[in-house]
């Protein structure tokens, strides 16, 4: 029996990155031997065991053979005669097909070290094409390591295109697509994930609402980048700089979906695209089974982001109504989230990356003023039932009006 550290732990250590999880491959053993040594079996489809002390995963070396459609259609073979090289060959990328023995020596049968040095994401073998989930995984790795200047090898991107055009991605379940997407949204450069999917044609299959934005022009005066698809990825990049929250990043990604519905004869203007985009956000989220909290914020951002841009022109009643509409009284975090997504929208444009966004500050200030109006004062004043809500709203509007007179500049 020989045990090797494999995959991500080896890769990230060589890149000088923190190692989170360590996975091990056991060569020359059987399930019974592992159980006799005190390991606990956890894998149903193939033999994976938990170490009795560290609880890290130890998998018997195995091979995989395509036996059905999609990413689950594989037959696994695990036996003592499966070599380390056999096991590493089934992995997706060469940089993930590295192993390290007890002496610290790196075993590299597929030139993963060379690809690490050259910052290349390259598939190990043609078997890559048998698993459609790998298209999303490579896009996610491209996003994860973009700050280290990694790029996808030409032949790997070509294979991803072939897989997409062959309809392989249609076998992916919504849950797996969302899981990979959510993971990509946590990276430093989530926009790269969607750019890669666009480059290989997968965006049209998995995110048609986003793909439809590419080639749709916006007024050059406000959008020097012109293309709405490019603007969308720029805003996502900016959102990633402003907030680590997946819901903020996803909402920013979806903020302009309504522009994909504008008839070409009306281009480059997109009047009413915000409210129009809400149903597309709902459609996308329903298809991918996006969590409700993330979906709800994305719908609100689509509907109201342009309203925030015009904040100096809003009257106090409209401002308080906005807080009602986003349910800020029960979910106050939405004010900050709306401020961040609107800022990402404004700064996610060519030449506008460093502009100030005072509307975000004014939104936050107006919220502090409105929510500081004490409910108990209204009750103690003798108001009852529905009158409490009406009087509370009136006082909030008055407080915001007073603040706006002093702090918020008047529009021209």
Curated annotation (Swiss-Prot):
Enzyme Commission numbers on file: 2.7.7.72, 3.1.3.-, 3.1.4.-
Presence of the UniProt keyword Metal-binding in the record: yes
Matching PROSITE patterns: HD
Positions bound to ATP: 8, 11, 91, 137, 140
Pfam families linked: HD, PolyA_pol, PolyA_pol_RNAbd
Domain HD intervals: 228-329
UniProt signal peptide: none
InterPro entries to which the protein is assigned, alphabetical: CCA_bact, HD/PDEase_dom, HD_domain, NT_sf, PolA_pol_head_dom, PolyA_RNA-bd, tRNA_CCA-adding_enzyme
Entry cofactors: Mg(2+); Ni(2+)
Positions of Mg(2+) binding: 21, 23
CDD domains xref list: HDc, NT_ClassII-CCAase
A GO biological process held by the record: tRNA 3'-terminal CCA addition
A molecular-function term among this protein's GO annotations: ATP binding
Cofactor note: Magnesium is required for nucleotidyltransferase activity. Nickel for phosphatase activity.
Record family assignment: Belongs to the tRNA nucleotidyltransferase/poly(A) polymerase family. Bacterial CCA-adding enzyme type 1 subfamily.
Subunit structure of this chain's protein: Monomer. Can also form homodimers and oligomers.
Purpose: Catalyzes the addition and repair of the essential 3'-terminal CCA sequence in tRNAs without using a nucleic acid template. Adds these three nucleotides in the order of C, C, and A to the tRNA nucleotide-73, using CTP and ATP as substrates and producing inorganic pyrophosphate. tRNA 3'-terminal CCA addition is required both for tRNA processing and repair. Also involved in tRNA surveillance by mediating tandem CCA addition to generate a CCACCA at the 3' terminus of unstable tRNAs. While stable tRNAs receive only 3'-terminal CCA, unstable tRNAs are marked with CCACCA and rapidly degraded.
Protein name: Multifunctional CCA protein
Biological source species: Escherichia fergusonii (strain ATCC 35469 / DSM 13698 / CCUG 18766 / IAM 14443 / JCM 21226 / LMG 7866 / NBRC 102419 / NCTC 12128 / CDC 0568-73)
The encoding gene: cca
């Amino acid at each position: 029996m020989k045990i090797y550290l494999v995959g991500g732990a080896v890769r990230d250590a060589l890149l000088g990155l923190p190692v989170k999880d360590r996975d091990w491959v056991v060569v020359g053993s059987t399930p019974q031997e592992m159980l006799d040594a005190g390991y606990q079996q956890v894998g149903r489809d193939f033999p994976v065991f938990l170490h009795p002390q560290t609880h890290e995963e130890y998998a018997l070396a195995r091979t995989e053979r395509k036996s059905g459609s999609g990413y689950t259609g594989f037959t696994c073979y695990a036996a003592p005669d499966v070599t380390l090289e056999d096991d590493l060959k089934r992995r997706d990328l060469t940089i993930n097909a590295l192993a390290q023995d007890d002496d610290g020596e790196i075993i590299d049968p597929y030139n993963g070290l060379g690809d690490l040095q050259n910052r290349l994401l390259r598939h190990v073998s043609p078997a890559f094409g048998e698993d459609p989930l790998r298209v999303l995984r490579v896009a996610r790795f491209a996003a994860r390591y973009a700050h280290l200047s990694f790029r996808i090898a030409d032949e790997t991107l070509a294979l991803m295109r072939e897989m997409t055009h062959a309809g392989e991605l249609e076998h992916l379940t919504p849950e797996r697509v969302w899981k990979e997407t959510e993971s990509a949204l946590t990276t430093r450069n989530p926009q790269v994930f969607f750019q890669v999917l666009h480059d290989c044609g997968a965006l049209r299959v998995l995110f048609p609402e986003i793909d439809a934005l590419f080639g749709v022009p916006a007024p050059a005066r406000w959008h020097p980048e012109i293309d709405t698809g490019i603007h969308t990825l720029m805003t996502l990049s900016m959102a990633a700089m402003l907030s680590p929250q997946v819901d903020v990043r996803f909402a920013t990604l979806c903020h302009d979906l309504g522009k994909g519905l504008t008839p070409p004869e009306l281009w480059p203007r997109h009047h009413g695209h915000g409210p129009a985009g809400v149903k597309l956000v709902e459609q996308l989220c329903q298809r991918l089974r996006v969590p409700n909290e993330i979906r709800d914020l994305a719908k609100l951002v689509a509907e109201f982001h342009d309203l925030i841009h015009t904040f100096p022109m809003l009257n106090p009643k409209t401002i308080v109504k906005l807080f009602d509409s986003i349910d800020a009284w029960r979910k106050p975090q939405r004010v900050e989230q709306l401020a961040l997504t609107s800022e990402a929208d404004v700064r996610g444009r060519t030449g506008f990356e460093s502009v100030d966004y005072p509307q975000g500050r004014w939104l936050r200030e107006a919220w502090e003023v409105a929510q500081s109006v004490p409910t108990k004062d209204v009750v103690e004043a003798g108001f009852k039932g529905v009158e409490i809500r009406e009087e509370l709203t009136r006082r909030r509007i008055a407080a915001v009006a007073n603040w706006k007179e002093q702090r918020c500049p008047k529009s021209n």
